[in-house]
From Swiss-Prot:
This is Arginine--tRNA ligase. It comes from the Bacteria. It comes from Mycoplasma pneumoniae (strain ATCC 29342 / M129 / Subtype 1). A motif ('HIGH' region) lies at residues 113-123. Keywords: Aminoacyl-tRNA synthetase, ATP-binding, Cytoplasm, Ligase, Nucleotide-binding, Protein biosynthesis. Transmembrane segments: none annotated. One of its GO terms (biological process) is arginyl-tRNA aminoacylation. It is an enzyme of class 6 (ligase). The gene is argS.
Amino acid sequence: MLFINTDLQECLNALNLEFDEHKELVKLVKNNSFSGFASTVVFHLKGVNQKETAQQIAAWLLKHKKAHYRRVFVANNNFINFEISPQKYLDFLKTKPTFAPKPTKVLIEWVSANPTGELHLGHVRNAFFGHVLNNLMVFLGFQTVREYWVNDYGQQARVFGFSVYQALHLQQNIKVTPHPDGYEGELVDSIAKTITGIPLDKLSFEEFLQQPFLDQLLADCTAKVLEVIKQDLATIHIHFDSWKFESQVVKETDYKKLLTQFKDEAHYEKDGAIWLKTTLYGDDKDRVLVRQDNRPSYFGTDVAYHLDKAARGFDLLYDIWGSDHEGHIKRMHCVYEGLKIHQKCQLKITALQLVMLYKNKEIVRLSKRAGNVITIKQMLQMLSEDAARWFMLSQTNNSIIKIDLDTANLQNSSNPVYYVQYAYARMCSVLKVVDQAALAQVNDCSLLTHEKEIALLDQLVYFKSLLEKVQVSHELHLLTNYLYETATLFHSWYKACKINDPAQYNLTQQRLLLLQSLHHVFGQLLQILNITAPQQM
C-alpha cells in the first residue's frame, strides 16, 4: 500500500474521523494546477466541513509525519496535495521494489480453447493476458498454478471428431455430406492420416455418436490437437503446469451427490432435465445442469470443474474468458454463492473482447471451422511478439483490439513498444560506464528539483501501489500505460537535463541514482510483460 494511504488512515483514526477503508484515498494526478499525489478523502467523510477538515489533516500530517513530506497543502477544490520530502524519495531510490512471499494459493485458468484446431489471433489476447497476470502474481509473492481447461467432452469436440472421420472418407474418394458446423483445413486432414482401424461406413453424425470407436477417436483427436496447441503456446513463451480434461472431470462427478450440496429448493426436475434454480442467487433465469440424455450441459461441466478447483485447496481462482462467455459469469458466481464456496475460495472472472486484424484496410474474418484463420505462426510473420503483446495488453479489457500491421511494425517513436524499449536501452547505455561503488555511497537526492525529476520520482513512488492495484482490478493496460508515461517523462528529462555533468558531481550522482532506479523498474515491468528489454538499439 502507498505510504501516503497508511499515513492518511493513521491521521483519520487520530482525528476520530470515520471513513471507508476500501476507498482509494490517494491518486497520482497530472493537471495544469498540480502534478503529484492528491487525496479527495474529505469528500468521503460525512458531516464535516470539507475545507476545515482538509486543513486539519494537512496540519496533522506535517506535525506527525514531517519526515515524509516537504509540503502538504489544501487546494481550492479541497483536494489535499502532497509534496514528498527528499528524505522519503531517497528511500525509494535506495530500495528495490520487492514483495514478501504470501501463503495465498492461486489457480489461474486461461486460454482453454477448444481442442479443435490451432490457436489463432482470437486466442492470443487471452494467452498474453493470463501469462502476464500470472507473472504479476508471482512477482507479488503469490503461489500460482497455471491451468488449461481442455474442453474435450462437449459438442464442438464431437463435431471435430466427426470432421476427422469424414476426412477419412474424402481421402479415399468417398463422398460424404459434411456436418453444417464441421471443420476443414490442413490440421483435420493431417490428423485423419494418422487414424487407422475405423470402418468407413458413411455414418450420419447421430450414428457416429453411437459407435464403439467414438471415445478413442475423440481422445486421439484431442491428443493430436493439444500437441499443436502446446507448440503454439511455446512459440510465444507460454507454458502451463496443469492440463485439466473436461471428460475426466465429468467421469469423476456424481451429479446426484453434487445436488445434495445445494439446499433442496435450489434444484428441480423439468422436462426430463435437472435444473439449478440460480434465480435464487440473482441470475436472470434458471439453468439446466443435466440434460434429458443424462449428459451434463456446458454449464453442468463448468459447475463440476469449478467445484473441483475449490476442492483442491486454492484460496483464489482466476478465470480468463472470451467475451462470448460474458453471460456465463453471473451464473458461475451464483453457484459459488449457492454453495457458500465464495466464503473460503474467491472467484474472479475476466472476460476479454475480440481482436480484429486490419489488412488492406479491411477486417480479416476469422473462422476456425473453415480452416481460414490467422494462426500464431502466421501472426509472428507479420509482427513481432513484443509488438503483439504490447498492443493486446495496452487497452481496457472491454475494448475490442484493432491492430493495424503498418503501425505495429514501425521502428520509431510512433510505435509505443519501440519508444519504451528505446528508453530502457538509453538507460543501459548510460549505466554501463557508471562507477557502481560510488553510486552506492549516494545518500541524498535533494538536488533533484527539476519538474521532470520530481515527476519521475513520483512514478517510482507509485510503482508498488500500481502493481497491487492491477492485481485487484485485472486492468493490465495500466502497466503499459505506466511504462509509456514514464518513458515519455524519461525522454523529455534526458533531453532537458544533462545527466552526466562533470562540473556538478553531486547532482550527477543523484541523477544517476534516479536513472538506476528507473532502469530497475523498467526491467521488472518488461519482465512481467515478457517483452524484450534491449541493452542497446
